């Protein structure tokens, strides 16, 4: 049995991720999907929580039919910001795997140095199928829904994700004092 690893931040999950995962699912028996920057949320670069990203992946994989095709695992991978030991860290966090799928040259290099087979999966419409571009469109009020699976667009609306991203993008001068005030727990 051959198991592959695919790591992404999925902020949010988009059609390019699903196209890449279709390629990955065709190459191996089981797929480990590592959710990078798992500790990060509520920032412009990482607006969604790990749980929200997992929900997006589950819904998108169900919608695409991939969830019925192969067994997959969703594994949160918090950042360690230490490239030289990142691969052993990932190895300690996920089940055993034989091949890594990536479009990131640093990730490819780090895994090759540790002796892994690395497959550079095709990138699909990278200019527009990019989470950065999707978040930009959300902020600017431009159409973004066609760039993500329908189930993901619906979920982002359910959790008011666009409103969150717009809030994170605003200056918030009028609310600055309120946001900087310490949270006080009422005494009873």
Swiss-Prot record:
Q: Which UniProt keywords apply?
A: ATP-binding, Cytoplasm, NAD, Nucleotide-binding, Nucleotidyltransferase, Pyridine nucleotide biosynthesis, Transferase
Q: Which domain of life is it from?
A: Archaea
Q: Which Pfam families match?
A: CTP_transf_like
Q: Give me the Gene Ontology terms describing cellular component.
A: cytoplasm
> What does the record give as the reaction this protein catalyses?
beta-nicotinamide D-ribonucleotide + ATP + H(+) = diphosphate + NAD(+)
User: In what pathway does it function?
Assistant: Cofactor biosynthesis; NAD(+) biosynthesis; NAD(+) from nicotinamide D-ribonucleotide: step 1/1
User: Record keywords: Signal included?
Assistant: no
**Which Gene Ontology BP terms does the record give?**
NAD biosynthetic process
Give the UniProt subcellular location, in the record's own words: Cytoplasm
Under SUPFAM superfamilies, the record lists: Nucleotidylyl transferase
**Enzyme Commission number(s) of this protein:** 2.7.7.1
* Gene3D superfamilies xrefs: HUPs
GO MF entry, a single one: ATP binding
Recorded hits in HAMAP family, A to Z, give:
NMN_adenylyltr (MF_00243)
Protein family membership: Belongs to the archaeal NMN adenylyltransferase family.
Q: What is this protein called?
A: Nicotinamide-nucleotide adenylyltransferase
């Amino acid at each position: 049995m051959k198991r592959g690893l695919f790591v992404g931040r999925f902020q949010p999950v988009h059609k390019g991720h699903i196209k890449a995962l279709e390629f990955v699912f065709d190459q191996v028996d089981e797929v480990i999907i590592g959710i990078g920057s798992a500790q990060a949320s509520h920032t412009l670069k990482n607006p969604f929580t790990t749980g929200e990203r997992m929900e997006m992946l589950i819904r998108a994989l169900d919608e695409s039919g991939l969830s019925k095709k192969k067994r997959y695992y969703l594994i949160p991978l918090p950042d360690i910001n230490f490239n030289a030991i990142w691969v052993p860290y990932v190895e300690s966090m996920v089940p055993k795997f034989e091949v890594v799928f990536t479009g990131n040259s640093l990730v490819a290099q780090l895994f090759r140095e540790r002796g892994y087979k690395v497959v550079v999966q095709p990138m699909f419409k990278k200019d527009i199928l990019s989470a950065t571009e999707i978040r930009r469109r959300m902020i600017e009020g431009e159409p973004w829904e066609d760039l993500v699976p329908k189930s993901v667009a619906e979920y982002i609306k359910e959790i008011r994700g666009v409103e969150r991203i717009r809030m994170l993008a605003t200056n918030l001068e009028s609310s600055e004092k309120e946001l900087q005030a310490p949270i006080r727990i009422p005494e009873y």
